[in-house]
Amino acid sequence: MVPFFDKTQTVDQANALPGRTTPMPVATLNVVTDHSMTQVPDGLEVAIFAMGCFWGVERLFWQQQGVYSTAAGYSGGYTPNPTYREVCSGQTGHTEVVRVVFDPKIISYKQLLQVFWENHDPAQGMRQGGDVGTQYRSAIYTLTPEQQTEAESSLQRFQQAMEQAGDKRAITTEVAPALPFYYAEDDHQQYLYKNPEGYCGLGGIGVCLPPQG
């Protein structure tokens, strides 16, 4: 008998799928921005966010002025070079993420954090709306100590704003230094540009991120 696997419980490393050594083939260019999905030009920076299904999350960020490129992928887990099917099984430890390459002279990391907090529900644990599983958990994966500090500060401010709005739930967003990022299959890249009527479960809770004091 195959044991039941609870997709709302994060797998540990010993029980994660083995994955593979070969990276996922990835298109050279983002079809929306016409910029590279893999290269980061001098002066630009990278952010990684998880807000549920990455289709809508990627569209949200490519719409922001100052965002150079975006890519859908997987991070936060153990399985190297996972497939979408493997991530959806809950046995990789990964969550669906979007890698955002941005120009800090046009849009700051703080502004990206505001987009993050105000456009999903960060207090749902291992789900986002009707999408249930560890791959839909909310997360901010930081690339620098400065990003880590800003992300932690923003979480505290948004928690206070939720409480002031009468929402007493605890934020479940994971804030942690980034583990390796793995590109999703090409079908998932810029999905809602290629499929304008496709599914998007993204939505905020009506709370705004207060400015830093």
Swiss-Prot record:
GO terms for molecular function: L-methionine-(S)-S-oxide reductase activity; peptide-methionine (S)-S-oxide reductase activity. Its EC number is 1.8.4.11. Pfam families: PMSR. Belongs to the MsrA Met sulfoxide reductase family. One of its GO terms (biological process) is cellular response to oxidative stress. One of its GO terms (cellular component) is cytoplasm. It comes from Serratia proteamaculans (strain 568). It catalyses: L-methionyl-[protein] + [thioredoxin]-disulfide + H2O = L-methionyl-(S)-S-oxide-[protein] + [thioredoxin]-dithiol; [thioredoxin]-disulfide + L-methionine + H2O = L-methionine (S)-S-oxide + [thioredoxin]-dithiol. Keywords: Oxidoreductase. The gene is msrA. Has an important function as a repair enzyme for proteins that have been inactivated by oxidation. Catalyzes the reversible oxidation-reduction of methionine sulfoxide in proteins to methionine. This is Peptide methionine sulfoxide reductase MsrA. The keyword Oxidoreductase applies. The active site is at 53. The keyword Transmembrane does not apply.
